């Protein structure tokens, strides 16, 4: 029987890795571990069918091998049973136990061969089979080499091992085929058919060995080495990593948890949903992490064995080679498992990140008005850019946390096994060091939470300011708003500094704890005499403590990262649980047979649920299909809220709302997406040329198209910032017309266009193109009211009157007041006495015909000039290829941190020198009998303590270097952005700037400073290790230098592609954030058109485009590290081989331990160096991107000391335009073509002209938002181009075309600089008709203003802007379409206020309403950038002037109302 099964006594001898006992026990342990994991999944499959794949049968080879395994199992079990019954009484004889264990393992192998599992189960069992076979073959080879007897069963099972290798290869091939089958399922179909799918990453089709070695990355890296990678070279994400699939799984889990009442009581449903979806795949990641931990902890034992072998009197080369083979195996397991653990955890993290980003985006599409008030656009972008993005690394930190904790425990066991009770004092000290991490972890948690709160506040303010930069520049508020951003950053920086200094002290503890603990352990050994202080013991202890130091250092960081993740989970949870729009509050259905289009009965609606008085009260409304309904009323009456009630956007308090048919919505504030004009009009619908051209003409856009360099394919900036207000409004209207909806909700669509264009839009668009549609039109243009079917008059949230035009006139009251106000404005228009209304209409028609001829001629002239077109939005710039040391030098140079950098480097050099000296002392002293243990430990402790000062200096100087750089770069970046010309903001989407202000700055804050020193530290340590190894065995330097050279080649090969991947990734992040920000601003329009699903699918594509670069970057990193580990392992194995081959006595055992201890750290140090060098190379791209914006060309200085105007300037307000020519870009055509005229002091000048004639450009030139190409502007004799911008803009007042309010309160919106008293503010409010409204609010001047003033109507926002200029009281006032969004009555009041308050001022009024400028002293008429006319309006009216034709056309548009009301 002994010959059959062998004898397995207890291991009662000294530790020997070559012993049969140890080998069989280790193999059994590994197999039992795999067995347990396998059965866990088998049990899980009984509950869920996810892991058992039906429909795919195993091949006959698997069945045959399974039968053989089962037979082998029965043999082992039978032999074991026989041994148990007939064995001897010796308790040390346990062969029957070994047989039973072997029998269980073999029968489990049989089961695993027959089970059809998912991809991950197949990988698990394949790894098990390969591990079993290789370990079995190595063990039996070792027995044969040692000359020991081999069991008969070992011979019988040898072919089984080879068959298991074959099965593992076949199993992995079948898994790859299954993955390819999955790639053609519906989930992989392109989401947007117009964008065909690229070839996916080669991982989807890679074989087992290609996956194992990351060789599937070779084609991409080879391409990147030959040329800089471009976005076209990047493959698409593999189907199983797509954002759609990730979100689908998350959404299902989320819905399940929401439906479970017990789950909703839990604090964080987002975390639970993530665990529910990704728990199972992370078990496999945990297996990799466990195997790596097991291999790392075993390495100190290998050191013990090698030193013991070198000190042995009877050295057997077979044992030496076996020890070397074990070392190779352990390093191989460590390397492969670590690389795949890192890659798999980040890949899983990427899926979580994609799922949460998409979930946050989907949520904002469903967020209620209250939810949108609680979560600003900037905050939503932050949830995506920071919180969800952080999940890409969360799983890596999580697995690091538990696996390093396990590593600490196993290392403790090894330490006790080597030195016994002597380890106890050291472990107590190590425990104390660990406990010290707890307060640090709490401090870091608090710092991180507060940092993120401060960061949210800063990014929200930054987003708001960037979106309103034009107003800020016009008002010269840059300094004040920059201080606001800097104040937010100061709060953020305070917590950043605390966090970084806390981490610096934690870093000090990490580096010092092994040194201090080792001294205490040696002291314990000496006092307790638990182990001799020889070379084996000392260097095994040092190696073990080095293994233990990694957890001590990283566990606090892991805790910090997990805490950060928990904070992000909580923030996302709060967001995803917020109120959603209640779609059941309105009933939506197809066209009704009764002909009803909109029906509201007893409707009460309120923006604020806690408000006792609803915003809209007792609304009764029934509109038939095809009716044209106008809604009018004073500012703040609730007109826009009524449209929101129809859309379901305003919370319903009571009543019913029914809408029959599809809806198209045109918002009062234009919402334009980044992209082409055509894309904005088509809005995702297929191109139908006939319908498209009809929509263009109906919205009077056909003439504008020729003004754009690329026609309707011209790229426009974010929110259409580089289009005029009229162009944006007409594009928005064309979008609605092209949509071919049933019900049209138009919110004051004509406010931003001139009277002629408004007439064209009303007649050609509303009356002709939409003649069979239902239209609800909110308007202040009274001239169109007589041509609608029904008019609703609103006051204070109620419909006070309803009926046809004539009926309402007869009723009088509110409607009569509106009409009278309009008539008062119209009747001031001077008419020649011999003109009748009929003549006027005829003149208007004749003028229109002549005007069209003029326009056509001008267009022909434009076409003949053949000026090259210029895209309004520029493609994001990025560096290409290797840029050398410039970004690194920029980082140090901008922060002026050379002194701190060299202090850090010298601190690290001093630390490494003293550490090497301390270990060399141990190696040297243990061979000298005269040196006592006290002296040995004492000198070691003194030298080690000296190194403490250096490592502390390094940690503190590094932290201060990072903080100094963060402050310098933020300051430079902020200054550059605020000083950038307006052209920069016109051509740069806000998302690009926000990406630099958020994720790039975050990298600069946290990653770059420590990356610098973490490159220096391992470089110094690597040098020290090679010097020591060369000192002991000089021959190793040959291999070491070759390995280093090869490492450099591989590293450079990798970096050529990695740099471009990171750069491209930098350009893919911004669209993701930009798209989310745009969606947040236009969510009402998106929901109204019913295009939320299309936007959602577009966003999925953007997320995938970003995710694939994260995926490839991580895969490339693992590719390079695996190869570098292999190269450095060659150096390690060479060193070990030399130590085996060198005769005994040639090298002292202490030096053997010293050399091998440094050799064991060689791979880790090189990997650490490579990883941090690559991390620094990648992170420095964020520095490069921020520095890129720090070099933006500046606009002229705010103040020029030697050119400052007198404090009383301008005392008169006279403006001279001298041959003024303006173009926006060097290659663009002239927008103003040599204008010359004079605005006399105290005059009121009206500026009129068609949309796009150059009116707004003239105002931009006056405020120097754009500099003249030639010519100049003189104010009171001073050339404004010669003085500072602040001196100019502070002396000018403007009410802009788009009224802008900022988040805060009423007081700060009226007086951002805080220079006026409350009395002055109240007086200004009274004059601008807002005092009554605000005095009724609970908080008066401190009442809140939400993002972009959304809780105030557009008209009220315009009145706030009027209040600002009333406070400033400058000598020159500009009104840029200032009354376009208010009713005629309020317009008349404002004009009266301006006449009274600015009687002695020069007032420049740009207007579309002729009555607004008709009482001006002078009128300037512009056409296509030329000054057509400039004279008194009365004189212009006496001739056949361009202005008289504009008046005539305004009369023509008002003909219905004018004829009726002039008779009243």
Swiss-Prot record:
- Listed binding positions for ATP 2 are 1249-1256
Q: Where does the secretion signal sit in this chain?
A: 1-22
What's its top-level EC category? translocase
GO cellular component term, pick one: cytosol
> Might you give the EC number(s) for this enzyme?
7.6.2.2
The membrane-topology field of this record reads: Multi-pass membrane protein
Let me know which tissues express this protein, per UniProt: Ubiquitous.
Q: Where is the ABC transporter domain?
A: 600-821, 1215-1449
Keywords, sorted A to Z: ATP-binding, Membrane, Nucleotide-binding, Repeat, Signal, Translocase, Transmembrane, Transmembrane helix, Transport
| Entry's transmembrane regions | 27-47, 61-81, 94-114, 123-143, 152-172, 203-223, 283-303, 321-343, 391-411, 413-433, 508-528, 909-929, 931-951, 1008-1028, 1030-1050, 1132-1152
Spell out the family assignment given in the record's similarity comment: Belongs to the ABC transporter superfamily. ABCC family. Conjugate transporter (TC 3.A.1.208) subfamily.
The free-text function statement in the UniProt record for this protein reads:
Pump for glutathione S-conjugates.
Q: Which PANTHER family does this UniProt record tie to the protein? A: ABC TRANSPORTER C FAMILY MEMBER 8 (PTHR24223:SF108), ATP-BINDING CASSETTE SUB-FAMILY C (PTHR24223)
Name of the protein this chain belongs to: ABC transporter C family member 8
Which organism was this protein described from? Arabidopsis thaliana (Mouse-ear cress)
């Amino acid at each position: 029987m002994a010959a059959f099964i062998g004898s397995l006594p207890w291991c009662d001898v000294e530790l020997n890795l070559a012993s049969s006992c140890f080998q069989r026990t280790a193999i059994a342990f590994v197999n039992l571990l795999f067995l347990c994991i396998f059965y866990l999944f088998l049990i899980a499959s009984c509950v869920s069918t996810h892991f058992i794949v039906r429909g795919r049968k195993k091949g006959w080879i698997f069945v045959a091998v399974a039968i053989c395994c089962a037979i082998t199992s029965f043999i082992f079990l039978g032999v074991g049973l026989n041994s148990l019954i007939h064995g001897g009484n010796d308790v040390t004889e346990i062969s029957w136990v070994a047989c039973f264990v072997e029998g269980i393992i073999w029968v489990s192998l049989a089961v695993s061969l027959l089970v059809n599992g998912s991809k991950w189960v197949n990988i698990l069992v394949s790894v098990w089979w390969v591990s079993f076979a290789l370990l079995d073959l190595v063990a039996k080879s070792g027995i044969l080499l040692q000359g020991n007897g081999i069991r008969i069963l070992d011979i019988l099972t040898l072919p089984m091992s080879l068959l298991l290798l074959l099965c593992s290869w076949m199993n992995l091939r079948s898994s790859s085929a299954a993955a390819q089958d999955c790639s053609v399922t519906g989930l992989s179909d392109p989401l947007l058919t117009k964008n065909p799918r690229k070839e996916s990453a080669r991982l989807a089709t890679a074989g087992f060995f290609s996956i194992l070695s990351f060789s599937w990355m070779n084609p991409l890296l080879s391409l990147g080495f030959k040329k800089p990678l471009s976005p076209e070279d990047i493959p698409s994400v593999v189907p199983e990593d797509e954002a759609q699939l990730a979100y689908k799984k998350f959404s299902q889990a989320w819905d399940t948890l929401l439906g479970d009442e017990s789950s909703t009581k839990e604090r964080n449903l987002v975390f639970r949903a993530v665990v529910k979806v990704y728990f199972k795949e992370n078990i496999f990641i945990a297996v990799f992490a466990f195997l790596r931990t097991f291999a790392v902890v075993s390495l100190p034992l290998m050191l013990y064995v090698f030193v013991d072998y070198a000190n042995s009197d009877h050295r057997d080369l077979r044992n030496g080679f076996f020890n070397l083979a074990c070392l190779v195996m352990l390093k191989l397991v460590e390397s492969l498992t670590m690389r795949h653990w890192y890659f798999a955890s980040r890949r899983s993290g990427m899926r979580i990140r994609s799922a949460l980003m998409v979930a946050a985006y989907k949520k904002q599409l469903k967020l209620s008005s209250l939810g949108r008030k609680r979560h600003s656009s900037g905050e939503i972008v932050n949830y995506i850019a920071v919180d969800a993005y952080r999940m890409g690394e969360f799983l890596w930190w999580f697995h690091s946390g538990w696996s390093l904790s396990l590593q600490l425990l196993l290392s403790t066991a090894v330490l006790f096994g080597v030195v016994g009770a002597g380890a106890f004092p050291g472990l107590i000290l190590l425990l104390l060091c660990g406990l010290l991490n707890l307060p640090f972890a709490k401090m870091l948690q608090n710092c991180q939470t507060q940092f993120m709160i401060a960061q949210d506040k800063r990014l929200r303010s930054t987003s708001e300011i960037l979106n309103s930069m034009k107003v800020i520049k016009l008002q010269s508020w840059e300094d004040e708003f920059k201080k606001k951003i800097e104040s937010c950053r100061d709060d953020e920086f305070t917590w950043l500094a605390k966090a970084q200094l806390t981490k610096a002290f934690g870093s000090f503890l990490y580096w010092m704890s092994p040194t201090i603990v080792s001294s205490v352990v040696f002291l314990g050994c000496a006092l307790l005499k638990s182990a001799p202080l020889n070379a084996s013991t000392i260097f095994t202890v040092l190696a073990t403590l080095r293994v233990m130091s990694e957890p001590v250092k990283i566990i606090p960081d892991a805790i910090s990262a997990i805490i950060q993740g928990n904070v992000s989970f909580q923030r996302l949870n709060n967001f995803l649980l917020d109120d959603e729009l209640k779609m059941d509050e309105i009933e939506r259905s197809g066209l009704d047979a009764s002909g009803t289009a909109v029906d509201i009965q007893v409707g009460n609606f309120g923006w604020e649920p806690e408000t006792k008085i609803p915003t809209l009260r007792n609304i009764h409304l029934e509109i038939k299909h095809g009716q044209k309904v106008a809604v009018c009323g004073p500012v703040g009456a609730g007109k826009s809220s009524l449209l929101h009630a129809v859309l379901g956007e305003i919370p319903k308090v009571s009543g019913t709302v029914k809408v029959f048919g599809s809806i198209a919505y045109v918002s009062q504030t234009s919402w334009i997406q980044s992209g082409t004009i055509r894309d904005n009009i088509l809005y995702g619908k297929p191109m139908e040329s006939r319908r498209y051209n009809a929509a263009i003409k109906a919205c009077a856009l056909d003439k504008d198209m020729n003004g754009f360099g690329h026609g309707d394919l011209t790229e426009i900036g974010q929110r259409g910032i580089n289009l005029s207000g009229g162009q944006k409004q007409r594009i928005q209207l064309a979008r609605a017309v092209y949509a071919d909806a049933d019900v049209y909700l138009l919110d004051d669509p004509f406010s931003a266009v001139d009277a002629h264009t408004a007439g064209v839009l009303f007649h050609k668009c509303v009356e002709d193109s939409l003649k069979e549609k239902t239209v609800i039109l909110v308007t202040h243009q009274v001239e169109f009211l007589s041509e609608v079917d029904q008019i609703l008059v609103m006051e204070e949230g109620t419909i006070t009157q309803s009926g046809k035009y004539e009926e309402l006139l007869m009723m009088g009251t509110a409607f009569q007041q509106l009409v009278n106000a309009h008539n008062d404005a119209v009747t001031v228009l001077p008419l020649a006495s011999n003109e009748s209304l009929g003549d006027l209409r005829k003149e208007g028609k004749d003028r229109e015909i002549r005007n069209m001829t003029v326009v056509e001629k001008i267009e022909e002239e434009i076409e003949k000039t053949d000026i090259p077109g210029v895209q309004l939005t520029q493609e994001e710039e990025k560096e290409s290829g290797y840029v050398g040391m410039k970004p690194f030098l920029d980082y140090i140079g901008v922060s002026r941190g050379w002194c701190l950098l060299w202090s850090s480097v010298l601190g690290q050099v001093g630390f490494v020198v003293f550490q090497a000296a301390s270990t060399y002392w141990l190696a040297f002293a243990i061979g000298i009998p005269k040196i006592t243990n006290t002296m040995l430990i004492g000198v070691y402790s003194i030298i080690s303590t000296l190194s403490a000062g250096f490592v502390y200096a390094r940690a503190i100087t590094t932290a201060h270097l990072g903080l100094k750089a963060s402050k310098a770069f933020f300051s430079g970046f902020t200054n550059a952005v605020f000083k950038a010309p307006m052209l920069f903001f016109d051509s740069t989407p806000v998302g690009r700037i926000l990406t630099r202000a958020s994720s790039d700055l975050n990298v600069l804050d946290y990653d770059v400073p420590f990356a610098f020193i973490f490159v220096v530290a391992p470089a110094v340590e690597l040098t020290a290790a090679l010097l020591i190894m060369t000192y002991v065995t000089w021959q190793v330097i040959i291999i070491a230098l070759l390995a280093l050279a090869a490492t450099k080649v591989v590293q450079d090969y990798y970096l050529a592609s990695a740099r471009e991947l990171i750069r491209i990734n930098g350009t893919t992040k911004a669209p993701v954030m930009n798209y989310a920000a745009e969606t947040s601003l236009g969510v009402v329009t998106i929901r109204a058109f019913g295009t939320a699903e299309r936007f959602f699918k577009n966003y999925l594509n953007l997320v995938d485009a970003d995710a694939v670069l994260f995926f490839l970057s991580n895969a490339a990193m693992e590719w390079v590290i695996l190869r570098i580990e292999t190269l450095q392992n060659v150096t390690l194995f060479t060193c070990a081989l030399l130590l085996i081959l060198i005769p005994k006595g040639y090298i002292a055992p202490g030096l053997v331990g010293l050399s091998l201890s440094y050799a064991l750290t060689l791979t880790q140090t090189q990997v650490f160096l490579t990883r941090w060098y690559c991390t620094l190379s990648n992170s420095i791209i964020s520095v490069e991107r921020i520095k890129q914006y720090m070099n933006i060309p500046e606009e002229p200085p705010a103040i020029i000391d030697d050119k400052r105007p007198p404090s009383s300037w301008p005392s008169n307000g006279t403006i001279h335009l001298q041959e003024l020519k303006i173009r926006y870009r060097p290659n663009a055509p002239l927008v103003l073509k040599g204008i010359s005229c004079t605005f006399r002091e105290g005059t009121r000048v009206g500026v009129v002209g068609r949309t796009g004639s150059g009116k707004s450009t003239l105002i931009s030139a006056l405020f120097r938002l754009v500099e003249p190409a030639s010519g100049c502007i003189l104010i009171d004799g001073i050339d404004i181009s010669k003085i500072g911008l602040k001196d100019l803009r502070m002396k000018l007042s403007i009410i802009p075309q788009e009224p802008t309010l900022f988040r805060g309160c009423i007081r700060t919106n009226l007086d951002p600089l805080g220079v006026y008293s409350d009395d002055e503010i109240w007086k200004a409010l009274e004059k601008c008709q807002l005092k009554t409204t605000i005095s009724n609010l609970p908080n008066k001047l401190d009442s809140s203003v939400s993002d972009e003033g959304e809780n105030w109507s557009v008209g009220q926002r315009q009145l706030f802007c009027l209040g600002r200029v009333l406070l400033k009281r400058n000598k020159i006032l500009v009104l840029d379409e200032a009354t376009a969004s208010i009713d005629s009555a309020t317009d008349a009041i404002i004009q009266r206020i301006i006449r009274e308050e600015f009687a002695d001022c020069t007032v420049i009024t740009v207007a579309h309403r002729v009555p607004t400028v008709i009482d001006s002293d002078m009128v300037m008429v512009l056409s296509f950038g030329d000054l057509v006319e400039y004279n008194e309006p009365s004189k212009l009216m006496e001739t056949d002037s361009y202005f008289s034709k504009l008046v005539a056309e305004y009369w023509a548009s008002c003909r219905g109302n004018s004829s009726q009301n002039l008779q009243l």
